[in-house]
Amino acid sequence: MGYCDGKWTPVIIMVMINSALGLANALVKKVLDGGVNHMVIATYRLAISTLFLAPIAFFWERKTRPTLTLNILVQLFFSALVGASLTQYFFLLGLSYTSATLACAFISMTPAITFVMALIFRVEKLNMKSKAGMGMVMGALICIGGALLLTMYKGVPLTKLRKLETHQLINNNHAMKPENWIIGCVLLFAGSSCFGSWMLIQAKVNEKYPCQYSSTVVLSFFGTIQCALLSLIKSRDITAWILTDKLDIVTIVYAGAVAQGICTVGTSWCIRKRGPIFTSIFTPVGLIFATLFDFLILHRQIFLGSVVGSGVVIFGLYIFLLGKVRLMKEECEKKLPCRFNEDDQEEDDDEQYKKGHLMVVPMTP
C-alpha cells in the first residue's frame, strides 16, 4: 500500500540518483587514470548538462521566469565560478590523486561544511545552549574529524589484488603514494569548501531569481566557458580536447546527461516532495556504491582508513541532520506551538522552494 500511494517513490528515486552519482565518480576516476585532462572533463560535462537542461528550463519555467537582469547575470557568473569551475577543478584533481570512495566521502560532508561557513560569515545564527545547536555543532566537528582521518590515515588494505591488477597499479601508482594521497584529500576538502560556499552564494541569488532550472542552465553555461578557459591557461594542447576512446566519451556523456542532468531533475522533484533534509539522508548511498564500483570496475584496493574515515563522516552527517531536524521543529513550535506535522513541514518546504531558499544542487561534483 505504501508503494502504491507513492510514499516510497522519493526513496527509490534518491537511491537510484545516489547510485548513479557513485557510478559517475568511479567512471570519471577511470577516465582520469587514462590521462584525460580533468578540466576537459569538467568542460564537456557542464556543456552536456547545459544542453540537457535548457529545454526543461525553457518549457517548465516559461510562465514563471522573471527578467534576467545584468545584476543577476553577474551574480550567476561568480556563483558559477565558485560552484562549478573551482569546485570541479579541486574535486576532479583530488579524485585523480585518490579514489571515487574518498571523493564521495568528502561530498557527504557538504551540509556540515556549509553550516560551518554560514556561522563564520554570520549568515546563520545558532543557540549553542539548545540541544539542536549542540547536535549540529557536534555533527559538523565529527565530519571534520572524519575528513582528517581520511587524510592522515590510509591503513592496511582490506582486499587483495590479482597479479594483472597489481601490474596495472605499478604502471599508474601516483595515487598509492602517501604524499599524493594527502594532497588529493586536501584538494577534495577544498572542493567541498567551494561547494559549501556556493550554497550560501546561490541562496542569495535564488531570492532574486527563484527559477531553479533556468538558474542551473545559466550556471552550467558560465561554468563551461570558465572551465574551458582554465584548461587552456594550464595547457594549450588542442589534442587534449579530442576524445577517441569510447569509454571516455560514454563516461563524459553519462556524467553530464545523467549525473548532472537527470539527477538534478530527480533531486529537485524529491526536494519538492519531501524536503532538503530527506534528500541529504541518502548521500551515504552514493558512498557505498562508489566503493563497490571502485572495487568492481577499477579493481582498486579498499583500505581500512577509507572505511573507518567514511564511517565517521557518515555518522557525523546523521548527527548533524538530526540536530537540523530538531532545530526546524523548535522554530516551527515557536510559531505554532500546538501544530507540527508532516503536512505543515511539506507546506513550509514548498513555500521556501518557491522563494528559492530550497534549491536543487546542479553542480554535483
Swiss-Prot record:
Residue ranges crossing the lipid bilayer per the database entry: 8-28, 40-60, 72-92, 101-121, 132-152, 181-201, 213-233, 249-269, 277-297, 302-322
Location in the cell: Membrane
InterPro entries: EamA_dom (IPR000620), WAT1-related (IPR030184)
Keyword Transmembrane helix attributed: yes
GO MF annotation: an example: transmembrane transporter activity
Membrane topology annotation: Multi-pass membrane protein
Principal place of residence: membrane
Domain EamA: 25-144, 196-321
GO cellular component terms listed in the entry, alphabetical order: membrane
Keywords assigned by UniProt, alphabetized: Membrane, Repeat, Transmembrane, Transmembrane helix
Highest taxon listed in the record's lineage: Eukaryota
Family membership noted in the UniProt record: Belongs to the drug/metabolite transporter (DMT) superfamily. Plant drug/metabolite exporter (P-DME) (TC 2.A.7.4) family.
PANTHER family: WAT1-RELATED PROTEIN (PTHR31218)
Protein name: WAT1-related protein At4g01440
Organism: Arabidopsis thaliana
